[in-house]
Amino acid sequence: MWPQNEVYITGVNMGTKLGGYIQDILPNPGLTWEKARILNIGIDTRLFSDRLSVTAEFFKDNRHDMYVVNNKISSLVGNVKEFKQNIGKINSHGVDLSAMWNSNIADWSYFIGGTFSYSTNELIANGEVDQPYEWLKNQGRPLGENRGYIAKGFFNSWEEIAASPVQTFSDVQPGDVRYEDINKDGQIDVNDMVPIGYGDIPRIMYGINLGVGYKGFSITALFQGAAKVSRQYSDIVMNPFTDNGTIFEHQLDYWTPEHQHATFPRLTTLDNASLNNRQISTLNVKDADFLRLKTLEVAYDFPTKMIQKIHLKGLRLFLSGTNLITWTKYKWVDPEAPSLAAPLTVSYTHLRAH
């Protein structure tokens, strides 16, 4: 109930200062645990002599009385910074589906299965203050949604800069990112930040698992994917010379007076000079949907009669690979870990097992 105590200094500065305690944040003796109303409806069935199995589940999770800061309380009533109350509310819902088909045709066997998951939420109440513009509100929007500026390309001349709204982040020059003035007040600032894309957590995740076998030979594959997800590229991906580093090959497509239709803004080694270009915007937040061939395995299981002669219970030769192919519009880095510091690992394994 007492979120914080701070030191209160009294007296003159002679010798060692004596410390004491003051009340910094008002307590709330009426706090309670958050509450939830949860609904789950599901089915689990097998059909066609157990060759087809299906599982489906719908869930709804409405939480209220969440412990959040009430920013609507005026400071006129006293020091109420970070005063928390049970006023938060968020509603979530989604669906999980999975299915698998197994069958045989003569000496052939095969299976194909899939999973699908969708979830989303809506922030109903969080104690935020009234906003001057509808697009600044968090209430009524999904939790964790990306917000930023709308990038409108690059400034190509000083005349274009003079005729444009003032960008308040740092001094700009030709080659810097030009942002859209959403509220039309003649300057670019936090009031021009709008929802862009989705959040970092995918709303949709899915997988496909399939395989075929014939007289000891088998091929299996697993595909995984995600959709309705947006990620911000890290500084090292977007900005050359970050942390005294180098310039990467993909960053060579930078703005120059002779190359105005570039992917990246002008080159600079000064952090302050490029502060304008480092803002969260549609330039560095992109859709990170992907489909990946996660694993692929080709194998042969030797017949039991053959390996019994050498006193083995089982012998398998296989070649497997991991993260072999990824289909995505999210360039340069792994869409699941968008940093050049964490490259996607592709691996192959060729083993004998017994």
Please describe what each predicted stretch is.
Residues G15-R46, S53, R141-L222, P265-T295, ...:
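Outer-membrane beta-barrel transmembrane strand signature
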Residues A226-R316, G321:
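Extracytoplasmic gating/loop element in the C-terminal half of outer-membrane beta-barrel translocons
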Residues W33, V80, W101, Y179, ...:
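Tryptophan-centered motif/residue detector
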Residues M1-G11, R51, E122-R178, S234, ...:
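A surface-exposed, glycine/aromatic-enriched loop/edge motif typical of exported proteins
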Residues S49, F58, F217, F223-S230:
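Bacterial peptidoglycan biogenesis and beta-lactam-recognition machinery
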Residues Y8, R46, S98, Q173, ...:
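Intrinsically disordered, low-complexity regions of eukaryotic proteins
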Residues R63-H64, Y198-D200, K228-S230, P335-A337:
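A short local loop/turn or secondary-structure capping micro-motif enriched for an aromatic residue
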Residues M1-G144, I280-R352:
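Extracellular/periplasmic, surface-exposed regions of secreted and cell-surface proteins
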